[in-house]
Amino acid sequence: MHPALKYMRQDRLPHIFCSGCGNGIVMNCFLKAIEELNIKPEDYIAVSGIGCSSRVPGYLYCDSLHTTHGRPIAFATGIKIARPDKHVVVFTGDGDLAAIGGNHFIHGCRRNIDLTVICINNNIYGMTGGQVSPTTPYGKKATTAPYGSIENTMDLCKMAIAAGATYVARWTTAHPIQLVRSIKKGIQKKGFAFIEVVSQCPTYYGRFNISRKPADMIKFLKENSIHLNKAKDMSEEELNGKIVVGEFLDIEKPEFVEELHKLIEKLKSE
């Protein structure tokens, strides 16, 4: 039996993901992380919005919420305030997080709420038919951009840093070892931890732009990734089309829920 199965709702299998989808890689990395941290199913709550990646919590053997489009961070905030003893993990995608959920993303970072947000970024809307998302690279094709997108792309990690997150990292599905380490750090971080995972979507993004073969897409992700330390010495032209990976931020500052409960206790004593 696969070691991850004990952490999964086996009655929900088989999953709905397309063959070669990166969601399974990310889910496996997450399960490895909680196993290495010795986190039991009753110790964490998984929250998601709408989209392919948002189906991940439905397969996890834990308490979970499958919420409305773009709102998982809002729901997760309420959970963390009510149950600060629980690890709260949000699974989201580039459309769910950066488009309709952009406001919640910004203010979750700003408040520095103790959440671990894992964004599986496949550069496209996968579940609804391959439309352009906020992270679709300039010039890349989608069903709503058959001649190539003319929109500027959003850098999710830069947004998280600017908005106030305390841990920010980016990897791809071709970096599972590094991803496990970052998920562990994110869960242990007392504050808003944002982990972006650039993932393959062979059904839409790959078929339109790279290859419909998952192995080709993972090879592409690996070969086009540049570590942050190397990227610092490269020009903007040299970085064009590359994926900068690594840990961008790891700092400490007051966490929202702790500050809220301190205020409550202070007011009780007055």
From Swiss-Prot:
Quaternary state and interactors: Heterotetramer of the KorA, KorB, KorC and KorD subunits.
Residue ranges of the TM segments: none
Organism: Methanocaldococcus jannaschii (strain ATCC 43067 / DSM 2661 / JAL-1 / JCM 10045 / NBRC 100440) (Methanococcus jannaschii)
EC number of the protein: 1.2.7.3
High-level lineage: Archaea, Methanobacteriati, Methanobacteriota, Methanomada group, Methanococci
Pfam annotation, one family: TPP_enzyme_C
Protein name, as recorded: 2-oxoglutarate synthase subunit KorB
InterPro entries: 2-oxoacid:Fd_oxidoreductase, THDP-binding, TPP_enzyme_TPP-bd
UniProt record, GO biological process: organic acid metabolic process; sulfur compound biosynthetic process
